[in-house]
Amino acid sequence: MPFVNIRLVEGRSQQRKDEISKRVTAAISEVLQLPKDDIWVVFEDVPAGDWHVGSTTVAKLRKKAQK
């Protein structure tokens, strides 16, 4: 039973997560020839202040990009 853990910076809508889950599940089902009900997808929302790119938080990068 495949378990897919997707980590994203928080802020994505439930609708967007549902679409990602649908597509990931379909791809794994097709490639591994498994029923879709055997595939688990979990989302982890990470606060922008806890996600670092290099040594800078995503929160700071977003603020910088808005200037």
Outline where the language-model segments fall.
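A domain-level signal for the structural core that forms small-molecule/cofactor-binding pockets
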Residues: 2-67
